[in-house]
Amino acid sequence: MNADQLKQLQEPLKTKYRTEPDAALVTLKAKAKAGEGITCKIETGKSLAEAGLHPATGGDGLSVCSGDMLLEALAACAGVTLKAVATATGFNMKEAFIYTEGDLDFRGTLSVDKEAQVGFKEIRLRFQIETDEPNEKITNLIKLTERFCVVYQTLNQSNEIKTSVI
């Protein structure tokens, strides 16, 4: 896809969202069902995955780890956003790899140490980009990718999660 094709695809949506802001609000959903043992089956809309305990918390390693899925979601969203921004700005990118890493102290989730944080202490997002573009353009590409990546922004902001029982 080139910049003109992307613009043709997105311009009608942008126009609609400018005139009808409520149309831009879309509720994304996920559904999971508690599985056998200590697992949970997730319906992604495209496939079915089974999440389970990470080996560092007693899991057997046969199920996907929710923490890994979070990092995968960040890598996927950052990659799609990177490509969209590169396309829209005419950035010449031959190839790109997106890497995510996160540090977890499992003492927190296992309640071994009440001072240990439950959740990622730090998440790192790295881009390996093959391009002839100057560093200034690469820096701008990354800045725009961070700005428009939904998962990046969600993780980087404090968001309220409303929990309920139905």
State each model region's role.
Residues 1-72, 84-166:
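Extended beta-strand/beta-hairpin segments
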Residues 73-78:
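Alpha-helical metal-binding/catalytic segments enriched in His/Glu/Asp
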